[in-house]
């Protein structure tokens, strides 16, 4: 009995010690939201207040001090997120998570994001404000790495904390740019459809097919392969966005109202990091990406800006003809050129490093050797604007975050080549605007970038990049509002821009609501953000019903339940309220219609 008592007492003591150790560890790991923290390199004291949501409000007498403090508090809240994001574009996830991520690393390493980042860093002017504030931000991150507690994720994965550098900012932006792209999912699929079913099938899909564009029957599998690789990435994807800016003539108080709702997959921690910074020369309440110093969405007392994805086509695929008997050369402009070959190494946790070769043409990397499951017979190379053109995105983000007015803001946008963005703007002077930022380009007549192109010569090459002034935009339109929902822009000077724009459903609803009302206020705009009515699907119901009635002789008699379902869906107003059943019936109907047709 005494022995049992001793055992029980021992177990209780051990349990208490474990609990105490856990509480001490938890307290050690908790971010510091009160007290004083010594941070070397500050010129003066910086005050940081955290509100009830944990959002930092940073007050400093210089921008350099403010951005250094931002880097520190950003790191104490999100260091592991920063670590993961900087590794994705560089192809270094396998170092953290092991062999399961090798193919994902191979994809991103081969895309050339890391190499493009190195070039961008080399081109930065070290005397520029964008460079100096970026370095101040990185100094803050690295100060936390040196003196702050180690996040538990580093301990669990056995990962050593290492200092951040400028290249990491670009690698994070590069991953985000690729995650927004759609061509790698769509172009091969359309080429495969043409190969299997012919051009008539594509006409039914409202896709223009250029007979000069090659249909590559051997290029099968990459869509699913790349999609599955992206799904393994431990970071959420952008899945669409809404934004609108209402001019002073359509609001109750005569001031501009700005609304932006980026649709990003749920994640913990969230993609955005909110922070408010105030100095004598700078103030913004902004939303930052992990590891990026300047906000992508922000507002201050003078202006507000935000974004949606433009969805333009900035990735092209080119078929490549190899020399008979010599797979080390390919045909371009009637010459046989050697592939540029680079050896890459992927470090893998608890395993030997993986070495592989990346072959490149004048267009970019050969994808067949990168994505498992792709037929090797005909090489396909990928040309991506992000890595092809000089990248000035960091400078542009600095300039838009420091803009004093609309002209200043607009002039800052031309350096954003990829990803394509719809940048929304409103200011206290009553100006509203929308600009599409992207490096758009001309192609030869009749060439469609929605298919795999002929890479043997210049007949399907980019002719030239268009000046930013020719990009779609709208500044202070007479109807007094601008909006974007990832929808296609109207032609500019008769010119359309190829892209993977989303259906008009959201855009049409936004336009209908904005057009019908002239007394908007904060409350009504907030209600609009959560609107759940489709402006398109009720019209589709009418077409479905018309088609069904035209085939009445082929349709068996309906049961009472079926007839009630028909009546329910016919009276549907497009609402997706929780108690609404017609919306569920519509999508079930739509599913079988698409499946069978």
At which residue positions do the language-model features occur?
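Hydrophobic alpha-helical segments
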Residues: 418-517, 593-595
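Ordered core of a single globular domain
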Residues: 390, 404-410, 417, 495-597
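Second-shell loop/turn segments in exported
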Residues: 66-69, 116-132, 383, 394-400, ...
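Compact, glycine/acidic-enriched structural inserts
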Residues: 283-284, 289-354, 400
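Substrate-recognition/specificity elements adjacent to catalytic centers across diverse enzyme folds
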Residues: 20-257, 262-265, 281, 286, ...
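Alpha/propeptide regions of enzymes that mature by internal proteolysis
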Residues: 12, 43-48, 393-415
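Short helix/loop capping segments that flank catalytic or ligand/cofactor-binding pockets
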Residues: 59, 67-68, 254-255, 266-269, ...
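N-terminal Sec-pathway targeting helices
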Residues: 1-17
